[in-house]
Amino acid sequence: MPSNVSSAERPTFPKRAVITGGMPYGNKNLHFGHIGGVFVPADFFARFLRDRIGSQNVVFVSGTDCYGSPIMEGYRKKVEGEGYDGSIVDYVSANHEAQLQALEAYGISLDLFAGSGLEPA
């Protein structure tokens, strides 16, 4: 059966790609919306491109957003409600580590998970 698809109509792929996942706030651990709504689709696409153009040509990055009112409010509640005595940097760093562990537990293939206000990765 002859095909009507010419080689010009075949999909083309970039030579290199950077895939990003939306950065969750550093005020708590990840929930299902983060994992299933942001990271799984981005991970799927990163894996697909790694298969097509080579893993050395694809970088999948995300991180913790360390700024914003949700972080300030979460920190305030933790200090006032639970007697937390760490700094806001300690608070965000702990949540960043929890987020990273959650992503690793789900097998998300990030190349870099950094923090916008934390020390360089």
Descriptions of predicted regions:
Residues 2-121:
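N-terminal, positively charged nucleic-acid-binding surface of large information/translation enzymes
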